[in-house]
């Protein structure tokens, strides 16, 4: 079958940075390019793409190597400009070697470009404001929508409030209903993230809700089902039915501790049975609301294949019928892109499930916007040398994650959610009541709420 080529305006060499430029007639979806060489050689090169020829993003995690006369490279992005940079040859050598480049169009698969904005209302209530790249004050959700964001992720806490270190009224059922309506009215689709806790739930803490702490396993099973059903039914009744629902948040070590904890001395068949029984209850509640809602089981081991396989094997052995594998992947904690890439490919091969990056973020600065220690400064953090904190690195990392997701066969890498792109430093609206924000260096807005150009990466992808 004949492939359609994109309309290109001009092809030029740039000797100043040893690169070959292709300018398209307009921003178009490019499926792949073919580089035709005049003679055989082991060429090492990078590919960059841009919407405006000012801000460039690396297509993937590193160099391409080719010794063929024709090199085919998958792009799968919307772009107006393509730049091929030869890594180890002089400009003269490059211009002699390069024959021409063909640019092919295609049909883009649906792709999730989501944001978790669970704390947006709190940030706004305490005075946070957001500005577009023209300096105009705007609704944060409207700015994100203009860059192509199409999903909002909202977490649900059972009964937040002191003494659980966060003000009541945020991330509870009523708050989620309000945010869901606001997001859907602006054209977003929804993922609802049940923490099954009154506060943060992650691998280091899965505090059982205070109202559930004295329940037996059987009673807990019923309470989890009822709470899940109640929240989702309320969303359904107001016309904001979610597309996806997470049963638990980063539950690598289990949830509802210690009842369904599965780490350390709790890593026993009996404990895994308890966890999977509870997961099945949550899934049943979701499907009772609508069979169309896809369920996500989410862990935080984006770069750890051994632990990921162990976790999802335990679920497979117990016939947990979920739809999507959800992973957190923070490069500063979870290892290099190559580890993430090999993990998601193996998980797809092993379980034939769709793969979703439920959380991702990266620092755009080494500065701190307030006096709260940033999460990127924690002792176990490892900033990759090739990606020093900068807007450019933030854009390149996000594009690399997307590239790997789109490389999974059959379009099974379905997308990502950027975690708290709006968490700018606003007094009183930090991660914990009365404290500052430990995430202000990983947002998609600067400390004053101005939009960063790294949001262009969202626009690159359909």
Pin down the residues of each PLM region:
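Conserved, mostly hydrophobic/aromatic
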Residues: 115, 144, 193, 245, ...
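Aromatic-rich peripheral "rim/lid" segments of glycoside hydrolase catalytic domains that contact
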Residues: 264-265, 342, 346-347, 365-400, ...
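Active-site beta-loop-alpha junctions enriched in small/polar residues
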Residues: 117-120, 157-159, 195-199, 247-252, ...
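Substrate-binding cleft and catalytic face of glycoside hydrolase catalytic domains
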Residues: 143-271, 275-294, 300
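Glycoside hydrolase catalytic-domain groove-lining segments
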Residues: 134, 138-141, 288-295, 305-383, ...
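Acidic-and-aromatic substrate-binding clefts and catalytic sites of carbohydrate-active enzymes
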Residues: 123-135, 160-174, 252-255, 300-309, ...
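Aromatic, loop-rich ligand-recognition surfaces of beta-strand-rich domains
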Residues: 5-108
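Boundary/entry segment of secreted carbohydrate-active catalytic domains
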Residues: 107-143
């Amino acid at each position: 079958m004949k492939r359609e080529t994109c309309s290109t305006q001009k092809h030029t060499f740039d000797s100043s940075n040893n690169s070959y430029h292709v300018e398209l007639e307009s921003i178009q979806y490019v499926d792949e390019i073919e580089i035709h060489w005049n003679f055989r050689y082991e060429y090492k090169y990078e590919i960059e793409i841009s919407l405006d020829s000012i801000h460039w993003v690396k297509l993937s995690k590193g160099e391409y190597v080719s010794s063929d006369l024709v090199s085919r490279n998958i792009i799968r992005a919307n772009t107006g400009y393509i730049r091929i940079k030869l890594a180890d040859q002089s400009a003269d050598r490059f211009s002699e070697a390069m024959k021409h480049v063909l640019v092919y169009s295609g049909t883009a698969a649906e792709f999730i470009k989501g944001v978790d904005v669970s704390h947006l209302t709190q940030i706004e209530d305490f005075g946070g404001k957001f500005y577009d790249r023209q300096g105009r004050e705007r609704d944060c959700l409207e700015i994100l929508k203009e860059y192509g964001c199409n999903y909002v992720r909202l977490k649900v806490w059972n009964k937040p409030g002191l003494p659980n270190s966060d003000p009541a009224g945020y991330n509870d059922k009523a708050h989620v209903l309000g945010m869901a309506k606001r997001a859907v009215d602006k054209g977003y689709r929804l993922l609802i993230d049940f923490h099954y806790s009154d506060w943060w739930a992650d691998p280091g803490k899965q505090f059982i809700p205070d109202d559930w702490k004295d329940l037996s396993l059987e009673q807990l099973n019923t309470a989890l089902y009822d709470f899940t059903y109640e929240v989702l039914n309320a969303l359904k009744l107001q016309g904001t039915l979610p597309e996806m629902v997470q049963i638990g948040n980063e539950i690598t070590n289990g949830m509802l501790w210690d009842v369904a904890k599965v780490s350390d001395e709790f890593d026993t068949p009996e404990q895994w049975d308890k966890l999977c029984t509870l997961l099945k209850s949550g899934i049943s509640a979701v499907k009772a609301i609508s069979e169309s809602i896809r369920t996500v089981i989410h862990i935080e081991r984006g770069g750890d294949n051994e632990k990921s396989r162990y976790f999802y094997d335990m679920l497979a052995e117990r016939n947990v019928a979920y739809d999507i594998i959800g992973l957190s992947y923070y490069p500063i904690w979870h290892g290099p892109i190559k580890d993430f890439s090999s993990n998601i490919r193996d998980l797809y091969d092993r379980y034939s499930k769709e793969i979703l990056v439920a959380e991702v973020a990266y620092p755009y600065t080494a500065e701190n916007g307030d006096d709260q220690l940033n999460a990127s400064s924690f002792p176990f953090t490892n900033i990759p040398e090739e990606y020093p904190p900068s807007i450019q690195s933030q854009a390149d990392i996000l594009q690399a994650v997307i590239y790997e997701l789109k490389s999974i066969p059959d379009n099974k890498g379905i997308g990502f959610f950027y975690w708290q792109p709006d968490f700018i430093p606003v007094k009183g609206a930090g991660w914990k009541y009365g404290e500052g924000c430990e995430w202000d260096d990983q947002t998609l807005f600067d400390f004053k709420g101005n939009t960063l150009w790294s949001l262009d990466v969202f626009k690159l992808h359909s």
